[in-house]
Regions:
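Conserved ABC ATPase "signature" region
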Residues: 113-131
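Conserved ABC transporter NBD signature motif
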Residues: 57-65, 74
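Catalytic Walker B motif of ABC-type/P-loop ATPase nucleotide-binding domains
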Residues: 160-164
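ABC ATPase nucleotide-binding domains
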Residues: 235-257
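Conserved structural motif at the start of ABC-family nucleotide-binding domains
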Residues: 4-6, 19-21
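Conserved ABC ATPase signature
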Residues: 135-139, 143
Length: 257
C-alpha cells in the first residue's frame, strides 16, 4: 500500500522558515486537507511535497527518498495541480489532458488505446467534452482549472496534490470536481493532499484536516475537532458560528456589530 511519509519538513525563503517541522503521513485511499490563513505556508508545503521548491527533512514514498527519484519516476508517483496552472497556448484541451500519460510512456513510444481511453474517461467525468478541440487559451479561468485537474487525474499517480482545486469554480463544478476526486481516491486508491480556503467545503470530503498558521501545524484531526470557533478566531481572526450537519461542520461568519 503506497504511503507518503513526511518528517521534519522545512521550507526556507530568504533565510526565513515559511514551513517548519511538518510531520505527515497519508496512505492511498486517504484525503488530507491543509487549511490556514493567507501566508500560512499551505502552497509552499504542497510545492515542497511535489519537489518543485527546495526543502529539508524527509519526504518518503513507501520508505524511499522522493528526492532520489528522476522527474519521470516522480511523476509516476505524484501528480500536482497548481493554484494558477501555467498552460501552453496553441494546444487543444484533449492534447493537454493527454500529457498526463507522458510519465507512463516508454522512450519514443506513442500513447496506447488505453491512454486514450483514460483521457476520454476523465474528460467526460469532468464535463469537458464540449471543449475537447478548443485551444486552451480560449478557456475561462474555471474551465482551465478543470482541464488542469483532468490532466492530473489522467496521470493516474497514486498520490495527487491539489492546491486550491475549486477556487475558480462555481458551486456546481466545485461539487462535480470534488465528487470525482473522492470517487477515484476510493475506487483507484489514491492518496489526496489538498489545500482549501473554504472551511465548510474543506470538511466535506477529506478524512483529516491540518490547520497551518505561520508555517506550523497548530491543529490536526477530524473536521469536527479542527473547525471550531476557537481555532478559527485564534488563527484567522474571524468570528464564526459552526453548525453540525450530517455532511460535516458548516462555518458561518458572524457580523461584529
Amino acid at each position: 500500500m503506497t504511503k507518503l511519509t513526511v518528517r521534519g519538513l522545512q521550507v526556507a525563503l530568504a533565510s526565513k522558515n515559511i514551513v517548519s517541522n511538518i510531520d505527515l503521513e497519508v496512505s492511498v485511499g486517504q484525503w488530507t486537507c491543509i487549511i490556514g490563513p493567507n501566508g500560512a505556508g499551505k502552497s509552499s508545503l504542497l510545492k515542497a511535497l511535489a519537489g518543485i521548491i527546495p526543502s529539508t527533512g524527509e519526504i518518503l514514498i513507501d520508505g524511499a527518498n522522493m528526492r532520489d527519484l528522476s522527474h519521470r519516476d516522480r511523476a509516476c508517483w505524484i501528480a500536482y495541480v497548481a493554484q494558477e496552472p501555467v498552460m501552453p497556448t496553441g494546444m487543444r484541451v484533449f492534447d493537454y489532458v493527454l500529457l498526463g500519460r507522458t510519465a507512463h510512456l516508454k522512450m519514443l513510444a506513442t500513447e496506447s488505446p488505453k491512454d486514450l481511453e483514460i483521457t476520454h474517461y476523465v474528460i467526460s467525468e469532468l464535463d469537458l467534452v464540449e471543449f475537447i478541440d478548443r485551444d486552451i487559451a480560449t478557456l475561462s479561468g474555471g474551465e482551465r482549472q478543470r482541464v488542469a485537474i483532468a490532466r492530473a487525474l489522467t496521470q493516474a499517480s497514486p498520490i495527487i496534490l491539489l492546491d486550491e482545486p475549486t477556487t475558480a469554480l462555481d458551486v456546481g463544478y466545485q461539487q462535480e470536481v470534488l465528487e470525482l476526486i473522492d470517487k477515484l481516491r476510493n475506487e483507484k486508491k489514491i492518496a489526496v493532499i489538498s489545500t482549501m480556503h473554504d472551511l465548510t467545503v474543506s470538511g466535506l470530503y477529506p478524512d483529516r484536516l491540518l490547520l497551518l498558521a505561520q508555517g506550523h501545524v497548530v491543529a490536526s484531526g477530524s473536521a469536527e475537532s479542527v473547525l471550531t470557533p476557537e481555532n478559527i478566531a485564534q488563527h484567522y481572526g474571524a468570528k464564526v458560528s459552526v453548525i453540525n450537519h450530517a455532511s460535516g461542520p458548516v462555518v458561518i461568519p458572524e457580523r461584529n456589530n
